[in-house]
């Protein structure tokens, strides 16, 4: 019943109007799984390769017909007749056939779309929701939790055309009792933030991830307007709602220094920038900082972990790129204490589950994440629940590509009830 009988790849459009790969995996008995690969803007240099055509006459060179061709050709031929329930086996066939370290032959976008579509098809054949199938693949059947959202309500950096250096300013509704309540709290703060910004004569256009992208005078001002919005929404900052930031520091790392336009083009050393962040954590209840230094600045990260690692969650995104080899090295060297998990940085479900397991076994937290280029595919919601990861980062309270994931979490919570607790603050490293 779970034998693969047909594989289809197609070029679809993502939330930025760029092409991406969608795949369908059809099984005996009429079961079908469909999934699409996301795409990042600020990318780590060691991510698996997203294969683009480079033909400037189509989609400004961003077409994915080569990756789609790989799905419809060699990948389909290799997995036809195989058992979709053997996820690790299917992923291994594709990875081995690609034959490169970074999946540059077929493209991580091709392999990932098929990998996720295969998991969905297998779940359908087993007559179970995707999160339940993922929990079984993860070796943790029946163990679920609802993730605490990191809601990106002010966008800067590569995600917005403004003078804010830090890429994301997020809220985490840690005081909620359920994910549904957390989403309501996030929505209320989001709407109050619009009022605060309008009251200051600021722009309320949104960035790639649905957060506002106002022209603020400094990075600290972004935190100040969020604090104002939290209060206006009737919540207590630090108790009901905590703050998180994604610096994406590689984007403003120039010649060994961190150059911040929002701080008057001041250049910081690794140590100075760490203390700049430390000062912000003293002024505001920031409990999580992602990519607080450049991905190659491991000495700086060791220092940052020493200074801040006992107090707050330090998340590695560009730093670790969902790669177990790099994460293992980071764990051994005491770098950061959390990993951001992005399917397409590594390119298959099996490797993604391995990264989550390695992180958890080492006492690191794992934050499941979207990319800035997304589709209506909500697989990351099921991944977060099925691995009991504890945290999810999937944008703001606008744009249907972001909201699709929140709505899926609401549905899953309704189905699981008390079997999937929302643990709030306890999920965040250093906050239990």
From Swiss-Prot:
Compartments where located: Cytoplasm; Secreted; Cell surface
Domain of life: Bacteria
Residues that hold Mg(2+) according to the record: 246, 290, 317
EC number: 4.2.1.11
Catalytic residue list: 209, 342
Keyword Transferase part of the UniProt annotation: no
Pfam families documented for this protein: Enolase_C, Enolase_N
Subunit structure: Component of the RNA degradosome, a multiprotein complex involved in RNA processing and mRNA degradation.
Protein name, per record: Enolase
Source organism: Salmonella typhimurium (strain LT2 / SGSC1412 / ATCC 700720)
Encoding gene (name): eno
